């Protein structure tokens, strides 16, 4: 069993590493303003296994948490919200567009994860996959739906601006502490993906590219990521300082363009180009830049990234759904 890992890199900020499933890992951030706040809560057991021990080392407990800030509504970032609320009666503030899927697990699975089974001809296994997935999270309450540009005052000089960064989800945001140059990103800046051999999880590629444009206009000293992301040339540490952080943003943009360009070439504007054929052709080009490991049966990445291929397939074929035509 993985033990909790803490990294206090600022007097008011501590990173808390959490683990879930066989290979899953999510980074949370404890903020110390006038009270205690956490950015994201991980999966359902993360509060007890990882957040509580980190708080105990500081003489606090889960009941002392006053606020949860979510970067988006996915299970590995908001799946522990309900547990923290049960212990502390704290409020949950979440991007408005992600609040629904955080509270409705069936909708979240169907919108984001069902396609993996469908695209790999495993639809018959989808219900079992959903049942296993639901063990990782609980529906999240939401007290406040955050809007782009809001400034959240947490006290002791900690004011966080809500920066809209759709791409991973439509509602994804970063929290920008302008005074210190800290950007808390969740999954908004995804490098080459969080699992070696996979691809970044991008459901809305055009939005993702625009989000990279926006992020590059910010004065960032410390990039606080939601996972240990792979990149082209940098170590996988999830807190990146100075020029390393800026380089990671550039590489994230570059890799997104590599994936998009490879899929555009693969479909060559042909409406109805079968997804699997296009994906295999695109991956041949992508592997020239990123060491993607492929499943011998499906020809797709063994460890995630189908979304980046599928969303770009939709983008360049003009198809409305991969499942309305032959995959």
Region roles according to the model:
Residues 242-261:
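Short alpha-helical segments that sit at the start of domains
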Residues 47-50, 144, 203-207, 255, ...:
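Soluble or luminal CAZymes and related metallo-dependent hydrolases
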Residues 12, 31, 40, 72, ...:
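Divalent metal-coordination and catalytic microenvironments
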Residues 43-49, 56-153:
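Active-site HxH/HxHxD metal-binding segment of metal-dependent hydrolases
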Residues 43-46, 151, 159-247:
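Metallo-beta-lactamase
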Residues 37-39, 69, 92, 182-184, ...:
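Residue-level marker for buried hydrophobic side chains located in beta-strands
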Residues 4-58, 174-188:
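Conserved beta-strand hairpin/beta-sheet module of binuclear metal-dependent hydrolase folds
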Residues 257-327:
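C-terminal regulatory/interaction regions
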